[in-house]
């Protein structure tokens, strides 16, 4: 199949899944900002996105996008390493036209994956998962189930801890680098690769990625500061 047998096809898959994930991040960031404005409003969104059939279908689709994106990322990385052979061990000057993020996308991607695991542990495992277990008549802790739709509570608990705050900010820093390169690179792979448009996409990537990451970081910092003012830091 062309999408898996050719380098161009794999890049197209990477690009399409990457753009879809960027759109999800935008929605997720906007949703999180609601928590700063209104805890009740945020909890309403969380309840709407609980263990309902449409939310579960969306979650499954999102998980598939992540898995495909990660698999193809490693696949392309290994392919590029194999193509370079022993040349990759040679000491040469780094090309000025090659960005730092481009040279370290694998490392940045690994940090993003670890951060994703941490995020799933702190939120998905305490919110949608208990509701899903309850709906399937599986054992779910009563207290955990009671707080499953209280997203504001989980944000407050997570970001009152300085360790989590630092880890999340490191994760977001890596995500920013990953997005700034990945966004315009995706457009390039999809054909927007002439000199005029590639420069425009690089500019758009930097602005867009900065807005998204700052939105996430704002939630982390605001809730941490609130916890300090309330004396609730762990």
Label the model's feature ranges:
Residues 1-234:
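Membrane-embedded alpha-helical bundles that constitute the cytochrome b-like, heme-associated redox core
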């Amino acid at each position: 199949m062309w999408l898996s047998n050719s380098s161009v096809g794999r890049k197209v898959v990477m690009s399409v899944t990457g753009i879809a994930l960027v759109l999800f991040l935008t929605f997720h960031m906007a949703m999180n900002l609601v928590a700063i404005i209104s805890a009740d409003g945020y909890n309403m969104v969380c309840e709407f996105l609980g263990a309902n059939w449409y939310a579960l279908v969306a979650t499954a689709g999102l998980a598939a996008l992540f898995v495909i994106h990660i698999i193809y990322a490693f696949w392309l990385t290994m392919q590029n390493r194999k193509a370079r052979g022993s040349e990759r061990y040679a000491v040469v000057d780094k090309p000025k036209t090659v960005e730092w993020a481009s040279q370290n996308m694998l490392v940045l991607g690994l940090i993003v994956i670890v951060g994703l695991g941490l995020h799933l542990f702190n939120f998905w495992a305490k919110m949608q998962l208990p509701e899903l277990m309850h709906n399937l008549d599986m054992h779910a802790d009563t207290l955990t189930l009671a707080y499953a739709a209280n997203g504001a509570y989980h944000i407050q608990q997570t970001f009152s801890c300085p360790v989590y705050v630092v880890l999340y900010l490191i994760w977001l820093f890596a995500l920013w680098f990953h997005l700034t390169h990945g966004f315009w690179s995706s457009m390039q792979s999809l054909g927007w690769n002439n000199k005029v448009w590639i420069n425009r996409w690089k500019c758009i990537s930097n602005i867009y990625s900065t807005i998204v990451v700052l939105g996430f970081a704002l939630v982390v910092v605001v809730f941490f500061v609130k916890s300090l003012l309330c004396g609730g830091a762990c």
